[in-house]
Structures are given as structure tokens and as C-alpha cells.
């Protein structure tokens, strides 16, 4: 009897979203004989229609459920009968990863779902499994399963009908028990959606099947770091004789807040009131964020701040607890307490239908991670419009930085009162600070109204009275009704603007969020599909950020450039730990994109920039686990590429790193007035007597990583995606951390429109980022897919790594470092000889496996 890695649903995995529904194991076969494993890379079109003659699974669970019926689970009522019986639902799974889940139908042995799924897949498997389960207050029970062989699906024909629901003995779980379903596989190469590139001219529909549609018209400003001083980066020339303009993110935010007349809405993982957005030398007039918001609220502007409530920080009866994550949420709340600025500390709460265990996990481990600033701004004819900032920058300490990313030189100037380095114990007097690299954006156009809608949905949920507060009759009226304010341009008006300007953008807003964090999702789960939401168990999910990444990667024709704080996923295809539950498709999609291009003998390259290690002590258990998952992800991708090279006989001519490379950022800084520490006219600063070993090493080597906090991707120089979401399960599942992102392109600057490489704002942005990281620009960088460019960038990054790791301290002009692992010609990823641990701080670079089932690090 074959053992199928697909089915006892783990309690720790919530939701039922595609590539986010967790792992399941069923210890019985759903087919007789051995089946061939096939790679399914494309989409599955699935209908789960109905089941007939299901068993009554409710015994003890039935009686317990009756006692706990007041807990209120969102279900669809089934048979109108006093009989208490099973509460069935169906999960759809491949390679052990749940890719779809129906809603629960209460008290029915003949449920009718008629639920549709259109699911992207990139899995190697012998079967697609449909598991029929009985939902209970405490977990669920498997009734039986149906297996559809992938070999049959590869024929391309639709498979449909009534299929026996088999139990562990290989027989129907009850006489006549059947599941009505329909399933058809369409391979990637036959899907027109992915053949035309990412920004396919004026007719592009964006990412289909998402909560927010593609909005046409408007402007986008792209930012690298919180600030860029004029003249510090090389010039980048765009089409039409335009020179790329480097935005000043925090200064633009400060200006937008100052000029607001009606509303300022802010969301953050952390918002810290003493932060100074504008830092010009010797300018005492530039106040703090908190002071600025108070002034605006006194002017009559509605100022609402929605911040994650860190459960480990408390302020009770004068006793204060800082909190593990140092978000300063309680401090910010206290600062605004007696002002007209309204601050809501919003806990990450589990859904109504979640078990106690699941609710505890959600509230303790997961966060509200969105970072947005929404304001009204000047529009034509003396009216106002909505403008929104979206990206990776929280308005808190440690985030202000420039492309120079200093370690020591700004401790008494730009970073006075803003010292941040949580990786080891050090001080603002000694340093080094942790340099911070991030990506952000400003949306001026109809898509900004979707960012506003997200804020309103979250605020209404967070401000909903709880407990004794429910007795109050008044409802929250903090949100402005902009549809009742004539001088504010509405969404329909903003969308109908005829914008033929060649510099205009098409923009779409994406999220990772579920119905426990927003108000406005339908109450009836049957309506979920119509709103492009996915069903979890007793919850509705928007996981459109994941959908946006998959669509953009599949549509890529030339190259992918990613900067992200984390990079792990597609664990279903790892060589071990396949059941981890990091089921997002992004790493596998990139690897398969490269493999397909190799088979087609077409140029393609992927560049991925990540931090040297996740923030914190690199020797600690959580960070060692994350590094281990990252290593498994890299290994899987390189092995996939190597197999493609072997398949077409190019493995002696090329190696996997000719197509895929990982980088990190780092810098070192000699003392002022010196050339290097070995050739110094004066003695370098010495650590104080109480310095710890890591601090002593860092002060001696005068080096540190530049922390990559970015969450962005550029595809083919025509499409950009920027937001708050990391490339890990926490950010992409939709039932874990809440996230928001924007994806956009300029239709007049696309390959489809121009017939050649576009040189619009996105090209300028990517080149500007490369100029920051490499210290200069070359003409070859304009074509990242070319082998010469791939090898040149890798060569420069290897030289930079050697300079970073050397004993001699020298000033670094380039910051892009080859990620310090060795990748051989067969795609095997191992420790770099002589550099198994991180310089100065230690910790294995490829991480350590610790056998502990948890969701914190994935």
C-alpha cells in the first residue's frame, strides 16, 4: 500500500488558500498499483460539485459540538432536518500541499458546493487528492479521499464525474459515498495570459481574479531608501531625453502630510512618534512625525493611525514592558493620548471559527505588517484627490538611510537619536549602526483609492466594539465619508479621467489578509468566489500578492530582479523537509522559468538580493532555522536549473550560476582621515572596556551588512511590484501576517508597445538600484539577461565579498556582495571554503536544522 504525503491536517496550519492551506497526510492509498510522477506546471481548473451518501461522523464530537454551538462557526446550512450529522468540506491537495478548500456545509450527508478553483501549480506528483472531511469545533476528521492520477491530467482532457470516496481499507467510506468533481490541467505554454510579457500594452488586464482590479491612469513615484541626496548617484537616461529623477521618500511623505487638508491615515507594523522625516543639516525647524501629526489634527485634518499591537508590550498601571519586537506601540499610543490624533493598537486576532490553539498562534506569532500613508492632495479645479504611499518602510527608528549606507560617520549627525542595531549589543557612541536598504512607492491615481479602501476595511474591523463595549449604541464615525465630501474626487471620477499621457501608469493593489482583519468581506462563504476571495476553514482570504508574483514571473520574458528580506518557499519540492508547509510557489516558479528558457535556448537571468542574515543574532536558533530553509530553497532552485542544462546537453558549456545568482549587501568604512587600517596616519577608535566579543570584532573590522528590508521585484524593466510582503509563508499565505503591495507598469514603456527594450521609469529605477549597489554603471547593465552581464555582475560581487572579508580594512565603493555560499557546476550549494560562518558575529551561513515543528520561521 502506497503512503501518500497528503493528509492529516496539521492544527498549526490555518486557512485554506491556494498554496497556503498547510500540509495534510492520509495514511492510505487512493489508487491501486504504482503511479507515475508528473510535473504539473500551469493551472488546474477545478469544480468541487457535490457529495452523496456521506457517513455521519458525529459521535462524541456531535455532543461536544452541541455544547459549544454558541461559538458560532461560519457555515452554510445544509439539509433542513433536526438530525445532527456531519459538517463536510473538501480540501484539494498536490504534493502534500493544500491548494484549495471548500466552505463547510453544516449538517449534511448530501452537500452541494458547486465551488470553482483556478489554481496555479508547479508541483511534481502522482495524484491530485480530494479529501472529504468533517469539520468539528476541535479539528476535523477524514471521511475519505479521491485521487486523480496526474498522468491522466497531462492528456489535457477534462476529467469529471462521480468518484467513490475511499477510506483506509481502499473501499468506499460508506456504501454509495461519492464525490462529484471536475478537473482539467492546462500547461503553462498553452496559456495565452503568460505569453505576452508582463506589461502587455493598453489591453492588459493585470492580474485576473483579484479583489482589487487593475486601475488605469495616474502616476507612480518609485523610491530607493528613505532618502537620496542630489548628485550622489550616477545619471540614468530614459527614452525621450528624460533623466531619471531619484525620489526623496520621507521628504515627499512629510510634504504630503503638511499639505493634507482633509485626512491623514497611517498603517504600520511600527510607527514611532519621535522619528524625523526630514533631516537637513542644522535645520531646527524640522520637527518630529508626532509633532507634525498633532499640528495637522489641530488644523482640523482627520488623523488616524493604525498600528500593530505587539502582544509582548504592555502599559498597565504605570508599569511598562518594551516588547520583544521593540515596535514602541505603547509609547506612540501614550504620546497621542490627549490629542485629536486617533491611534488604534490593533492585535493580530484569529477568526471567529478558529480553534483556541489556532487563535493563540495567530495572536502570538503573526503581525499586522502593512505600511501605508494615505492623504488628500491638491487636484484640478481647486478640488482634492487621494494619494497613497505603499512599501517596506515603517515610520520608525532605524529606517532612515541613504544609498551611501554609513556605519559610523553619521552617528552624531543624521542618525543622532536614531541608532539601531539589534544584531548584537553595542551603543550609539561606538557603533556600528545597522545600515538599512528599502523600497517604497507613491501612487497618485485611481489605485490610491484601493489603498484607502484597505485602510477603511481594517479600521472598521479594529474599531468594532468588543466585550462590554458592545453595549454602547454609537458606532465608530472616525472615518471620513469621502463620497459625502464634494471637493474630494471620488474613485469613479478618478477612474474615468482620460489619460493619454505616455508617462501614465496602470496600477493594481494586492494584499495578504483574511476576514478576521477586515470588515466588508461577505458573510456568506458562497459569495467568496464572486469577490475573488478564497475559502479557508471558517475564514475568507485575499492572497493576491502571491497571485501577483506568480503571474509576473510566469509572464517574464527576459529577466527577474528581486530584493527581499526573506527568500524561502516551495518546500514541497525540496529534497527533504517537504512537509514544512512553506508552500508558496515563487522559488519554484523562478526555477522553472529559467529551466524552460534553457530548453528553448533563450536568454534569461534572475538576480536575487537578500540580507546577509535575517535581523538578530545569526547564531540564534530561529535565525539558524530560517537560514537552513533558505539554503534548502536555493538548493532546490539550482538543482532544477542543472537538470534542464543536462537535459539539453549544455551542462558542460554553462553552469546554474550563469542563470541564477543570490547576493547580499555589505560595507566597511575606514576611520575619517585614513586610507586603510593597515596604512593609517592615526590610531583607529578603540572599543570601550565593557564591549562584547561581537562588538570588539565589528569595531576592529569596521564592517557590517547593509540590511536588505526591501520587498520588491522588477521584471523585464517593464513591471514593478513593491510592498510590505516578504517571500515566505508568513507574508504570502493570507492567514498569517497582513500585507499590502502595488504592482504597476507604464503601458507606453512595455516590450509589447515598443517592440524593443523599454527605457521608462521602471528601467531607470532598476538601473538606479544597481548604481547604488555596484557604485557605478556600465552599458552592459542595461541588458541583464545577457550572459556577459550575469558574469560581470557576479565577478564584481565576488571582488566586493573578498574586500569585505579581508583582514585589511579599506573603503568600499560597491556594496553588492556575492552571497557567501559555494554553488558547484551541478547545482550543489554548500559552505564557502574557509568561510563557513558569518564574519565577526558567527553563525553557520547555510543554517542548522532543528527538528521543531513551528510556524514562526517560515
UniProtKB/Swiss-Prot annotation:
Name of this protein: Phospholipase D gamma 1
Regulation: Inhibited by neomycin. Up-regulated by PIP2 binding.
Expression tissues: Highly expressed in roots and flowers, moderately in stems, leaves and seedlings and low in siliques. Not detected in seeds.
pH-activity profile: Optimum pH is 5.5 to 8.5.
Residues modified as Phosphoserine: 680
Disrupted gene: phenotype observed: Increased tolerance to aluminum.
GO MF annotations, alphabetized: calcium ion binding; phosphatidylinositol-4,5-bisphosphate binding; phospholipase D activity
Cofactor note: Ca(2+). Requires micromolar level (PIP2-dependent).
The keyword Hydrolase is annotated on this UniProt entry: yes
Recorded GO CC terms: cytosol; plasma membrane
Residues involved in a 1,2-diacyl-sn-glycero-3-phosphate binding: 369, 565, 709
Enzyme class: hydrolase
UniProt function note: Hydrolyzes glycerol-phospholipids at the terminal phosphodiesteric bond to generate phosphatidic acids (PA). Plays an important role in various cellular processes, including phytohormone action, vesicular trafficking, secretion, cytoskeletal arrangement, meiosis, tumor promotion, pathogenesis, membrane deterioration and senescence. Can use phosphatidylserine (PS) and phosphatidylethanolamine (PE) as substrates only in the presence of PIP2. Can use phosphatidylcholine (PC), phosphatidylglycerol (PG) or N-acylphosphatidylethanolamine (NAPE) as substrates in the presence of PE and PIP2.
Cofactor(s) listed in the protein's UniProt record: Ca(2+)
Subcellular locations according to the entry: Cytoplasm; Membrane
Induction per the UniProt record: Activated by wounding, heavy metal, methyl salicylate, osmotic and salt stresses. Up-regulated by aluminum stress.
Pfam families documented for this protein: C2, PLD_C, PLDc
Gene source species: Arabidopsis thaliana
Membrane topology: Peripheral membrane protein
EC number: 3.1.4.4
Active site: 369, 371, 376, 709, 711, 716
GO biological process terms held by the UniProt record: embryo development ending in seed dormancy; innate immune response; lipid catabolic process; membrane lipid metabolic process; phosphatidylcholine metabolic process; response to aluminum ion; response to oxidative stress
